């Protein structure tokens, strides 16, 4: 099964209420700052530009890897909100994302604290089968949570604004005050 997801860089940004922002850049130059995460080379990433700005397209068959970057904890304290825009071209037909066998997402952005196994992670995910706001412990790891931010089936771009700092504090008890 081939799954497509697009992420729009002009809206994949960390912001504050004071309008500071940190953009994740999907231009050719910006792509050099993203590191491949996961095992193998299972996802094809291409970038492009349309009237809304640069975007990242991910294509995967059966399993996927990710792209990532490290940001300082201070940045999350200063800019707790993540604005993410994405469009799902093709979704899963049937899948039970609550189980280990069906634990797969058409699109997700993982945020977390820590670099090694045991890191505290939250997957901000799209699901056509679960309600927005659904939260569960990952069936694969104790330190990872799945949080559904979208179940839109329109095939159009949609944007969500998530307070990542608050979500990490709520799901993992991570303190950002020290």
Annotate each predicted stretch with a short phrase.
Residues 12-16:
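Hydrophobic core
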Residues 71-82, 101, 151-154, 176:
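Extracellular/lumenal carbohydrate-interaction signature centered on repeated Trp-anchored short motifs
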Residues 2-9:
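Sec-dependent signal peptide recognition
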Residues 26, 73-93, 162:
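Extra-cytoplasmic beta-strand recognition segments
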Residues 89-156:
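Extracellular ligand-binding interfaces
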């Amino acid at each position: 099964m081939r799954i497509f997801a697009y992420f729009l860089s002009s809206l994949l940004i960390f912001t504050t209420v004071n309008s500071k922002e940190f953009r994740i850049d999907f231009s050719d130059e910006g792509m050099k700052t993203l590191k491949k995460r996961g095992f193998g080379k299972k996802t094809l990433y291409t970038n492009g530009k349309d009237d809304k700005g640069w975007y990242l397209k991910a294509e995967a068959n059966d399993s996927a890897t990710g792209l990532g970057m490290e940001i300082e904890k201070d940045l999350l304290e200063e800019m707790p909100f993540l604005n993410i825009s994405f469009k799902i071209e093709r979704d899963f037909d049937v899948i039970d994302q609550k189980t280990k066998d069906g634990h797969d997402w058409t699109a997700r952005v993982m945020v977390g604290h820590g670099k090694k196994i045991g890191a505290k992670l939250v997957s901000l995910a799209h699901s056509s089968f679960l309600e927005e706001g659904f939260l569960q412990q990952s069936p694969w790891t104790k330190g990872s949570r799945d949080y559904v931010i979208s179940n839109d089936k329109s095939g159009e771009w949609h944007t969500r604004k998530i307070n990542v700092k608050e979500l990490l504090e709520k799901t993992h008890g991570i303190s950002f005050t020290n």
